[in-house]
A protein has these predicted regions:
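Conserved mixed alpha/beta catalytic, RNA-binding, or beta-rich assembly cores of soluble enzyme
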Residues: 3-170
């Protein structure tokens, strides 16, 4: 079963890193179940967004899991997200509070989510509504801004003309 995961807005201007958080989630998934990570993605969102922190990027991945593991994947993601919320609750106060969102889709998501999010401002309320209508599973808290990047990360479709950015951190 092909699954798309997207994560955005787990970082603060002074601490945290969405890329590192996403890597922790993918490692946890790999340790708990038999899966193949087919593709990792970095989505650079519209650079003029009001709520951007540092790099204004969201992370995504496409993984293959056994159909019998669909509920296990949801449980792993739910438990991980609960721990993430505890972690980000300890971040210092900020004018731009974190707004973590983790998106899971077992179907293709509307590709315009990606194109809209990289080309201009997208109202989080609209994506939240659309995601609910497509069957995407969303983990979020009170602030919903992270839904834009998380959904953009699950909706991009690569093709033969796509380019890739190599990411490394230590």
């Amino acid at each position: 079963l092909r699954c798309r995961l997207g994560l955005d807005d787990t970082d603060h201007v002074d601490e945290g890193c969405t890329t590192s958080s996403f890597d922790e989630l993918l490692s946890e998934i790999q340790e708990a179940m038999n899966c193949d990570i087919l593709e990792r993605r970095l989505v650079r969102l519209w650079p003029f967004a009001e709520r951007r922190t540092r790099g204004n990027g969201a992370l995504g991945a496409i993984i293959d899991i056994s159909e019998k593991d669909e509920l296990l994947l949801e449980k792993i993601c739910n438990d991980w997200f609960d721990r993430l919320l505890i972690k980000v609750a300890g971040y210092p106060p900020s004018k731009i509070p974190v707004s973590p969102c983790l998106a899971i889709s077992f179907d293709k998501a509307p590709e315009h989510w990606y194109w809209d999010a990289v080309r201009g401002y997208v109202k989080p309320e609209n994506i939240l509504r659309d995601a609910g209508n497509t069957g995407a599973i969303l983990f979020l808290k009170n602030e919903i801004s992270g839904v834009v990047g998380a959904c953009a990360a699950i909706s991009w479709e690569s093709n033969t003309n796509s380019s890739w950015e190599l990411i490394a951190w230590r």
